[in-house]
């Protein structure tokens, strides 16, 4: 049995519940998953409100965390996944994290800036649970100079604009957790890639990378 954290980005909202359904099906083989939701269009609205009304970074941060909770409810609805409001390994099946409550207790590793978004929350959760992290997004992987990288250290991506936020890269580097970035636009292909551990880009925190 394997366990991993799956971050599902808001960019996948059109197919995101199919991704969750695929995880639920995969969990019937004995695997367990903790889904960390993105912020989706709700977090985009928080950015707009901050720019328009000049709210503080702290307020925008917590509003964005609450936006993740809205997306969590969306992801769990009708998919067979269950909501959970604590950072813990599910005993079975698929759980979707409601992050506000556990982060209010302790979010010391998250700076309250837009460099630390839901990617950073997912990386923090993976670090706390010593678990692998998979980021489902709307690109084939980490793209540099027009090329999808098969594998790259987190250190090399710091300061570069890619599909994963800067805060997450710092957490990966500090914790040594790896993150597999996979294209989630085709849920069936995503699940197949996840099951095989192939495709996309492996961002290495520290230590060993892919075999073969």
Give a label for each model feature.
Residues 1-212:
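C-terminal catalytic "cap/lid" subdomain
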